């Protein structure tokens, strides 16, 4: 298997198997469009510490089947917020790294990793009050008490009872 060179935003070079790099649809499409590339591929939106984590995920999932198309079973899996044990441990990082992984997987077009990151965030807010969510993500409350009450009334139907 041939090797691909990737350059992170902070100019660190990563040499990876093409199979692993092609978990990224961005890279896979680029290679299909231009053929074999003998120069490093710059990834200006991904720092080395984040790219290292993303490549670790790609290495672990290199043999997973992923067609890039949404089928009925894929849609059912996306609706679930269940995450397998390895991915749950992989995503057990600080919030900044978690969000950087989500952004990188979106940029690199690695849908299964993006889904896993989004499910992780969804699980972080499941069952929490708006106040708890604000604390978790350091979000200031910019609503007046009157605005909050109005929003609660308008969304009463969505409350768990």
From Swiss-Prot:
It is found in: Cytoplasm; Nucleus. Its main location: cytoplasm. Gene3D superfamilies: Potassium Channel Kv1.1, Chain A. InterPro entries: SKP1, SKP1-like, SKP1-like_dim_sf, SKP1/BTB/POZ_sf, Skp1_comp_dimer, Skp1_comp_POZ. Keywords: Cell cycle, Cell division, Cytoplasm, DNA damage, Mitosis, Nucleus, Ubl conjugation pathway. One of its GO terms (biological process) is resolution of meiotic recombination intermediates. It comes from the Eukaryota. Required for cig2 degradation in the G2 and M phases of the cell cycle. Together with pof6, essential for septum processing and cell separation. Involved in mitotic progression, essential for the execution of anaphase B; required for coordinated structural alterations of mitotic spindles and segregation of nuclear membrane structures at anaphase. Involved in the DNA damage checkpoint pathway and maintenance of genome integrity. Component of the RAVE complex which is required for stable assembly of the vacuolar ATPase complex V-ATPase. Essential component of the E3 ubiquitin ligase Skp1-Cullin-1-F-box (SCF) complex. Interacts with cul1, fbh1, mcs2, pip1, pof1, pof2, pof3, pof4, pof5, pof6, pof7, pof8, pof9, pof10, pof11, pof12, pof13, pof14, pop1, pop2 and tfb3. Forms a complex with pof6 and sip1. Component of the RAVE complex composed of rav1, rav2 and skp1. This is Suppressor of kinetochore protein 1. It comes from Schizosaccharomyces pombe (strain 972 / ATCC 24843).
């Amino acid at each position: 298997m041939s090797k691909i060179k990737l350059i992170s935003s902070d100019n660190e070079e990563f040499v990876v198997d093409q199979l692993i790099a092609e978990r990224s649809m961005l890279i896979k499409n680029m290679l299909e469009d231009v053929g074999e590339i003998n120069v490093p591929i710059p990834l200006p939106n991904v720092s080395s510490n984040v790219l290292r984590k993303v490549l670790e995920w790609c290495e672990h999932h290199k043999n997973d089947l992923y067609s890039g198309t949404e089928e009925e079973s894929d849609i059912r899996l996306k609706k679930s917020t269940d995450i397998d044990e390895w991915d749950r441990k992989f995503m057990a990082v600080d919030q900044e790294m978690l969000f950087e992984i989500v952004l990188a997987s979106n940029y690199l077009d690695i849908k299964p990793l993006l889904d896993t990151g989004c499910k992780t965030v969804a699980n972080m807010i499941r069952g929490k009050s708006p106040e708890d969510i604000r604390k978790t993500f350091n979000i200031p409350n910019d609503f007046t008490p009157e605005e909050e009450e109005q929003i609660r009334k308008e969304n009463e139907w969505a409350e768990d009872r």
